[in-house]
């Protein structure tokens, strides 16, 4: 992986590209679509339906009264026709520009740093595409563990070798990462990617400290791998802003004197709407281009309609309004966390341990179970019977190891039910202890 330039060099990711991604060829039709915008061009290219056949006259959105502002957004005319028509594989150009401006403001990216953004149908689709860019079936992948099962699931189905890198209360542990890489067999290719969820991690709820991120970035340069920064909960950070860790994307230049090893994923799912299915990829242009090539050959594009709805909302808010909305959403989850943690302190002291999260919507409970019992068996045999459900820790273990952990989500359960939920979990632990 070479460098371009001297100061603030750009690491070239292309030597790490997989064999399979080279097989994707440009779509013969989709690659011509940007040329339709050239002045004076008469296009006979695309088999697009005529807008006069679209039955929708306008889309109107009424906004809630929030600190980000209120109002009504109407999409009609040519803009509506654009929202109902085929679009570009990379995504709506204006929406991409909006997010590129946000990344410069929030993460301090250079105007001409060789990076760009593209849009996907949710960040998980983009993560899957980037995995295809860098790995072939059977390749090893470094996976923050406990791991988000959505990604672990498709990695396992793709035949990848999952290499656990363990996290704790301070996030991903660089000592675990260094050990895995230092002890790697010399006759086997090293992993080329590390997947991590650094803020309000799903499932642990923990956030990686800035000092640890710096150590991990140094390891990425030393062992020549790419960091996949899945940061869906970044804007749901309700901790002390002064102690908030910068993103890997923001830190990379300061730590390593270069950029290009971090591929970042953002999402509107947790802060606007999961039903919109909009994710944002930020990476070196060569990586984005490969992702776009896969998109144009598989599902053509992200949804034009939801992209334009999102763009209309974000333009209405502006960056300041967007950040105000995110802060208000984070405050909602902070209050809900406080209610849940208070209930846990009343009922689960001595029965479980946990670390209070500073972002996201999860608490990772370590139940005090007998050695022969794991949380999956407990929930399967007693959870439904006693009217309480949570996700057993085995769901987040790449090797399906037994564990005494459970993941609880406080995002949707009514606050009035949190106390009873913790009381029922305590009852499960007590009954398990009595029968051991």
Swiss-Prot record:
Its cofactor is pyridoxal 5'-phosphate. Induction: Expression is positively regulated by the secondary metabolism regulator laeA. Pathway: Secondary metabolite biosynthesis. The modification N6-(pyridoxal phosphate)lysine is found at residue 270. It is an enzyme of class 2 (transferase). Substrate binds at residues 30, 86, 148, 202, 407. It holds the Pfam family Aminotran_1_2. GO terms for molecular function: L-tryptophan aminotransferase activity; pyridoxal phosphate binding; transaminase activity; tryptophan-phenylpyruvate transaminase activity. Its EC number is 2.6.1.28. One of its GO terms (biological process) is alpha-amino acid metabolic process. Gene3D superfamilies: Type I PLP-dependent aspartate aminotransferase-like (Major domain). Disulfide bonds: none annotated. Keywords: Aminotransferase, Pyridoxal phosphate, Transferase. It catalyses: 3-phenylpyruvate + L-tryptophan = indole-3-pyruvate + L-phenylalanine. Aminotransferase; part of the gene cluster that mediates the biosynthesis of terrequinone A, an antitumor agent. The first step in the biosynthetic pathway for terrequinone A is formation of indole pyruvic acid (IPA) from L-tryptophan by the aminotransferase tdiD. The nonribosomal peptide synthase tdiA then immediately converts unstable IPA to didemethylasterriquinone D (DDAQ D), via condensation of 2 IPA molecules. The symmetric connectivity of the 2 IPA molecules is thought to arise by head-to-tail dual Claisen condensations facilitated by the TE domain. Belongs to the class-I pyridoxal-phosphate-dependent aminotransferase family. This is Aminotransferase tdiD. It comes from Emericella nidulans (strain FGSC A4 / ATCC 38163 / CBS 112.46 / NRRL 194 / M139). The gene is tdiD.
